């Protein structure tokens, strides 16, 4: 039957996209395979290391963060759009909250090669379980990493997770952001950043933020909003600092 003008068809129905459709099917099959997932994790880690290694990085607050981590576990947070290259940049010895979905497991496999221990439970069903595990990691002396707008967004909207974790453990919160003079942006909900090779980049860690102990809902929401505002301001400062280096 001839196609009607204006009719909508899935991409797989068009020969033009058959190659990409087949590639997507093969990728999904590989993600479900233990060996395939491991191989993809290795390739992903290699890409991460290459993109980071081909940049000239200016790091602010990195040594201070490492010193704080030796004295007390930290809760390190950054927006989901900064996730791709943070694994090679973070101090080693952290535990990271990861999605239990196949793509999350691939990212966890790549991150593990850079010294990050995965903690499963970033999906809505596993949120309470993930929080309990993060509490256990902090009590055992390990710093933890959270993307507080992941894994589905909304973009740059901070969840209550970091506030709850800090209230339960007393651990301080460190904000992180990176930027570069040449970037790719993914057409995804978070507009994920990827550094183009052979450019300059900034990585900024904030000073430690201590949250006052409270059970008041309004006070907790004020803390959440404060962290969201400060993290957005840090991203803006990082972007502006990079622009100033042009």
Language model features: what each stretch is:
Residues 17-92, 109, 226-246:
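Membrane-anchoring hydrophobic helices of lipid-metabolizing enzymes
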Residues 157-217:
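A cross-family acyltransferase "interaction/gating" segment
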Residues 133-165, 169:
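Catalytic-site beta-strand/loop segments enriched in glycine and acidic/polar residues
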Residues 73-125, 169, 185:
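Catalytic core of membrane glycerolipid acyltransferases/transacylases, capturing the structured
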Residues 38-60, 98-139:
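Membrane-interfacial amphipathic helices and adjacent loop/beta segments
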Residues 99, 121, 147, 175-178:
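Generic beta-sheet signal
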Residues 1-25:
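N-terminal amphipathic/basic-hydrophobic helices that include classical n-h-c signal peptides
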